[in-house]
């Protein structure tokens, strides 16, 4: 079946003007995740912020109670004992000047980037490469740290970084279609709670305006915010 026809058929039974309780929304999304691969289940939260203003930026990291179902490749910029600590914790790529040169050469063999504080002057050279990908280490989300083992294990264990985009939207994967509905609901609530707690001082009016869930290839289902938050 062509992608367009599949998507049209998958929209059947979904009222685009209705807000569904999160449990029902997840069930509907799972039922429509019929691709041959294990689709990612995603959440999109429209927030009442304008990220062009520094006091309205929303970002953070949260460890989902049931993981993401995805194996992240973790890169660590560290030297000496901290480099060995990172390797022992399961980091996929560890280095210093050599790793900077590799990344500058166009090879990024990791999905999450962690650095010790002393490495940041060096890692700062990679801002134009890592920044647009949302991979630049940042102390606010725990990716610039001396606890490299904890950061690596957190990334491998299901931690998700979130950051509001230009349109005021936070999007994140919260599991796989193969997860039980209960586990997906728990993950949604954990991420939504973290986003709620990250409300910036400059936010005015209604903070969480709309929530929707979807699968990689499926339609979005609008969610009643009250069934997710609180």
Swiss-Prot record:
One function term, GO molecular function aspect: tRNA binding
CDD domains in alphabetical order: Ribosomal_L1
Keywords recorded for this protein, A-Z: Repressor, Ribonucleoprotein, Ribosomal protein, RNA-binding, rRNA-binding, Translation regulation, tRNA-binding
Transmembrane regions listed in the UniProt entry: none
Pfam families according to UniProt: Ribosomal_L1
One GO term (biological process): translation
Top-level taxon in the UniProt lineage: Bacteria
GO cellular component: cytosolic large ribosomal subunit
Subunit structure and binding partners: Part of the 50S ribosomal subunit.
Purpose of the protein: Binds directly to 23S rRNA. The L1 stalk is quite mobile in the ribosome, and is involved in E site tRNA release. Protein L1 is also a translational repressor protein, it controls the translation of the L11 operon by binding to its mRNA.
Assigned protein family: Belongs to the universal ribosomal protein uL1 family.
HAMAP family hit by this protein: Ribosomal_uL1_B (MF_01318_B)
Name of the featured protein: Large ribosomal subunit protein uL1
Organism: Nitrobacter winogradskyi (strain ATCC 25391 / DSM 10237 / CIP 104748 / NCIMB 11846 / Nb-255)
Organism classification: Bacteria, Pseudomonadati, Pseudomonadota, Alphaproteobacteria, Hyphomicrobiales
